[in-house]
C-alpha cells in the first residue's frame, strides 16, 4: 500500500515543476491596445511570444484611478494563435476617467500600463440596415444609430455605406453620409438592372478623433427598375439610323441591278459606235490661230455641272465672259470691206451614222505646206521659212505680240523699198522691160491683175501673189527708150504708214532693184517718180493667178525681206538726218536715173529750185539735160499749153506721197527723150516728169535747204493726210467745188467717186486723157513771175477733156526770203 502512494506522488511533482518552469519563460510580444465605445465597454488586445492558453494562464487587472475605487479582473480569450483579447466593463464613462492595467501570468507580472477611454474611442457599428426598392425607381437605405439619444456621440457620428454586386466583386461603390439622418437615397438607374446587390454601413466620430467602427451586418436585394425614356430614345435613334442605312444600301443595289439588266438595254446615242474625226490643226493661215495666252480657259467640271443644273443663273456670266468681237477689234490692218476676224476652232467633232465596218476614231493631222518659192529662197539666200511645227510655236504668242509683229513687218516692207525697189538686191537682174517690138514684153503694171483694161476686183477681195521675178531686159533694148527708177509704195488710207524712208534713202543703182512689186497690190497708192514704161505696140495681158489671203501676202513679203542679203555699194541707214539725205540723195539718184551730174543733190530746198529755174526757163519736160532743173515754177509750165479748155488741180507738194499708179497700159507710154518732144503726152501726169537735180555750181547750203524744205513741207501739207492745203475763193462760183477730206478738212481732190482697189486706176476721160494732163497754164500762174518763163514750157492736152476745169485750186502770194516760206490763201 505504501509502495502505491509513493508511485503517484512522483508524476504530480513533475507536473508542478514543469508548470513552474514554463511560467517563468512567458513574455508579451505586443503590448495591449485598448479602445472604448465611449459607453460601457472597452476592449484590449495583445500578442504573446508563443501559443498560450489565455483564459487559464493569463489575467488582466484594471482599476479606476479614483478614491475608494475597486480593482476588477478580466479573463482574456484566445484571438487566433498567440493573440489574446479582453473586454473591460465600465460604468458611465466620462472624459476624465483614467484606468491602470496589470497583466499577470500566475504570480509573474508580464505588463503594466494606463488607459484613458475618452482618447481612444471606436464607435459601435450601426444596426438594422434596410433597403427600400418600391419608392419610384429610387433605392432607400436606412439603419439605426448605435448610441442612445442621451449619449454624447449620438449627434456626432458620420456613416459610410458600401454597396457591391454579388456577381462581380469588383463592382462596388462607397457613399459617404455626412448628415445626421441615418439614411441614404440613390437612383436605381445608377445600378445595373436585374442584378442582386449587397450593402453594409459603418460609423465614425470626428470630434474625438476616433477610428471607423466595424461594418454592420450586410443586407441583400435584387435591383430591377423601368428604364427612362431617354435611354429608349437613344436606342431607337441608333436602330433607326442602322435601318435607314440598310434600306439605302438595299435600294442602291436594287437600282444598279435593275439599270444593268433593263435600263442599259435601251439604245442610247451616247453609247453608239460612231466615227469621230478629230482635226488637230485648222486648215487655215497661221495668222488666224489663237496664241496660247488667248486660248479660252477650260471650264472646270463642277462649273459645267452647275451650268447644266442651273442654266438660268450662270447663263449671264457665261455670255459676259465670251466676247467674240474683242478679237476683231484688236486685229490690226483690216480693211473696211473685210469681215471681222473670228477665232478658228482648233478641234472639231463630226459624227457619222453607225457603222460596224469602220474604225471608231480617226485622227487627222495637217500636212506640211509645200512652198516651192520659199524653199528656193531658203536654199539660195538662207530664208527663215520654218517648219509647220516651229511656225506653230512662233505664232502662238499673245495678241499684243501679233500686233507688234505686224507693225514691224509693215515697217520692214516699207523700209525695204528704199534699198531694193521692186527688184531683189542680190539678184543681178535688171528692172528694164523689153522693147516695144518684143512680143513677150509686158509692162511692170501688168503684174498687178487690177491694173490694165481688165475689170479690177473690189477692195475687200484678196489678191493673188507672184514670186516669179520680172523677166530681164532683152539685149536689143534701147536705153534711150527706157528709164527706170524707184517706185515707192504708199498707203493712202493710213497716212501714218507713208514711206518716209523713201525721202531719206535712195537706191544706189538700178541693178539693185528687185522684181518684187507684189506688195503694191494690196496698197492704195503707188507713186512712180519716173515709170519704166516703154513704148509698146500693143498691150499684153497676164492670166489671173489664184487668190491668196492678205496675211499670206504680208508674211511672204516679210520672209522675202529677211532672206535678202542686201549687198549695197554704199551702206545707208533707213532713218537718216535730212542733211545727209540731201547730200547722199543726189549721188544715188544721179547714178540710178542718170539725169544730172553725180554730185548734185536729189532733194533741194524749194527756194533753190525756184531760183535755179530762172537760169534756164526755156527748157522743160523729159527732154531736159542734166543741167536743167527738175522742179519748175508753175508759171513756167503754163504758157506751153495753148487751147487748154480748163485748168486742172495743182500737184500736191508732199515729196512724192500723193502719186498714183498708171491708169492703164494704154495710157502709160513714156515720151521720147529726144529734144523734139518737149511737152507732155495725153496719158501723162505732171507729177510723173523726171526731176533732174540742180547743177553743182547752183547748190545751196544743205542745212539751209533742209530747214527751208522742212518749213515749206510743214506749211503746205496737212499733218493728218499729207495733202496740200488748198482754199477756194468766192470767184470759183461757176466751178464744181472740191470735196474736202472727211478726216482733216483739206481739199484732196475729188473724193466723191466710189472707192476702188489700190491697183485699179479710175476710168480715164472721154478722150483717153487723164485729168492730170489737163492743166490750165493761165489759171496756175502765181504772181511775181515773168511772162518769159511762162512761155518756156507747154502742155498738149487732149481735146474733149473739159471735165477737169471744175477742180482749179488757187495759189497766190509766193514770197521767197532766205529759206523759202510759202503762205496759202
From Swiss-Prot:
Residues 257-825 are cytoplasmic. Changing residue 93 to A: Little effect on IL4 binding. A motif (ITIM motif) lies at residues 711-716. GO terms for biological process: cytokine-mediated signaling pathway; defense response to protozoan; immune response; immunoglobulin mediated immune response; interleukin-4-mediated signaling pathway; negative regulation of T-helper 1 cell differentiation; positive regulation of chemokine production; positive regulation of cold-induced thermogenesis. Residues 475-485 have a biased composition (Polar residues). On IL4 binding, phosphorylated on C-terminal tyrosine residues. Phosphorylation on any one of tyrosine residues, Tyr-575, Tyr-603 or Tyr-631, is required for STAT6-induced gene induction. The soluble form (sIL4R/IL4BP) can also be produced by proteolytic cleavage at the cell surface (shedding) by a metalloproteinase. Residues 1-25 form the signal peptide. Changing residue 576 to R: Probable risk factor for atopic dermatitis; lowered total IgE concentration; no effect on IL4-induced signal transduction. Changing residue 116 to A: Little effect on IL4 binding. It is a single-pass type I membrane protein. Changing residue 99 to A: 10-fold reduction in IL4 binding. Changing residue 208 to F: 200-fold reduction in IL4 binding. Residues 373-397, 433-485, 651-703, 782-809 are annotated as: Disordered. This is Interleukin-4 receptor subunit alpha. It comes from Homo sapiens.
